[in-house]
C-alpha cells in the first residue's frame, strides 16, 4: 500500500529524525520525502510504502508532535470530483477527455451547470449532468438546490471549470479548501464581460491564467499555479481569446495534478507545494 503523509507544525530541532524514527518503527519505507521551513513553521510530505495500521501510526505521530500539529495521512488513490461549469467548454472538455483517456488522477462523478449548453458534450462521456438554473431565483435558493444535488455524491473536490457564478460565503464554508477555480489573470484590470476584448483594446503584451483555491474573497484564494504567454500587436482579440483559453486549460490541468497528488499545503492565504 502507498500513502501520502503530510505534516505541518511549529519548527523545532530534530523533527525530521523524530518523524523518521516513528516511520521506521512501523516498518514503513519512505519512497520520497520533502521538507520546508518558513515563518517558523515546518512542512513535511512523504510518499510511504508498507502494510501498517494507519490509526495506530497516526496516534503515535500525534502523541509525539502534539495536538497543535497538522497531520494528514491519505491512501494514494484517484480522487473523486464534481465539476461546475456554465457555457464555456474548453476547460470542461479538456478534463472530460483526460478522464476518458485515463490521464486524469480523478473520477468525475458529475457535472453541475446553471445553463444547458454543455449537456450534449457531457452526455457523450456518460457522466451525469445536472442543470440547476439561476434564473428567476435567489443565489441562496439556487445554491440550496446545488447542495441537495451534491448530497447524492461522495467527492473530494469541487472544480470550477469556468463556472460564472459567485459562490456565497455560506456555500464556500461547506467545502473549505476543497474548491478549485481557474480564471484569466487580467483581474482586476479587466473585470466583467469580454475580458480579452478589453485587453486587446488596451494593448496588453502578456496573457495568463491563475488556478487557486476558493475562499470568501472573490478570486483571492490561495494560488496553486499560474502561467503566462507573450503576445504582440498582431493578435486579434479572438486570437487572444483562443490563446487565453489554451493557457487556462493547461494551468487548471497542472493545478489539479498537484492537488490530486496531495502535494499542497494551505498556510494562511498561501500555498506550499512539493
Annotate each predicted stretch with a short phrase.
Residues 1-79:
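A conserved regulatory-domain signal marking ACT and ACT-like small-molecule sensing domains
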Residues 8, 82-84, 112:
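Short hydrophobic segments within beta-strands
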Residues 29, 107, 128-130, 178:
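Conserved beta-strand segments of alpha/beta enzyme cores
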Residues 78-94, 98:
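Short, low-order "capping/linker" segments at domain edges
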Residues 99-107:
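A short alpha->loop->secondary-structure connector
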Residues 106-117:
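Short internal beta-strands
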Residues 115, 138-144, 153-274:
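Donor/substrate-binding cores of folate-linked one-carbon enzymes
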Residues 123, 127-153:
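Adenosine-nucleotide cofactor-binding segment
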Amino acid at each position: 500500500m502507498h500513502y501520502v503523509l503530510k505534516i505541518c507544525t511549529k519548527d523545532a530541532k530534530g523533527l525530521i529524525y523524530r518523524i523518521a524514527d516513528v516511520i521506521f518503527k512501523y516498518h514503513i519505507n519512505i519512497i520520497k520525502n520533502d521538507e520546508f521551513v518558513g515563518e517558523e513553521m515546518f512542512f513535511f510530505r512523504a510518499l510511504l510504502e508498507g502494510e501498517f495500521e494507519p490509526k495506530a501510526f497516526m496516534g503515535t505521530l500525534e502523541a509525539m508532535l502534539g495536538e497543535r500539529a497538522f497531520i494528514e495521512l491519505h491512501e494514494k488513490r484517484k480522487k473523486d470530483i464534481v465539476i461546475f461549469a456554465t457555457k464555456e467548454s474548453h476547460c470542461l472538455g479538456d478534463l472530460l477527455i483526460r478522464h476518458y483517456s485515463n490521464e486524469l488522477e480523478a473520477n468525475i462523478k458529475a457535472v453541475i451547470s446553471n445553463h444547458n449548453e454543455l449537456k450534449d458534450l457531457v452526455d457523450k462521456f456518460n457522466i451525469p449532468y445536472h442543470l440547476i438554473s439561476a434564473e428567476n431565483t435567489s443565489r441562496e435558493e439556487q445554491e440550496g438546490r446545488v447542495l441537495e444535488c451534491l448530497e447524492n455524491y461522495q467527492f473530494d473536490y469541487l472544480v470550477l471549470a469556468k463556472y460564472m457564478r459567485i459562490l456565497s460565503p455560506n456555500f464556500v464554508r461547506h467545502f473549505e479548501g476543497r474548491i478549485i477555480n481557474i480564471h484569466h489573470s487580467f483581474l482586476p484590470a479587466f473585470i466583467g464581460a469580454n475580458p480579452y476584448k478589453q485587453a486587446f483594446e488596451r494593448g496588453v503584451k502578456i496573457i495568463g491564467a491563475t488556478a487557486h483555491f476558493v475562499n470568501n474573497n472573490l478570486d483571492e484564494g490561495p494560488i496553486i499555479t499560474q502561467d503566462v504567454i507573450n503576445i504582440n500587436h498582431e493578435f486579434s482579440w479572438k486570437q487572444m481569446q483562443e490563446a487565453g483559453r489554451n493557457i487556462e486549460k493547461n494551468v487548471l490541468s497542472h493545478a489539479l495534478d498537484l492537488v490530486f497528488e496531495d502535494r499542497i499545503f494551505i498556510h494562511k492565504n498561501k500555498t506550499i507545494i512539493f
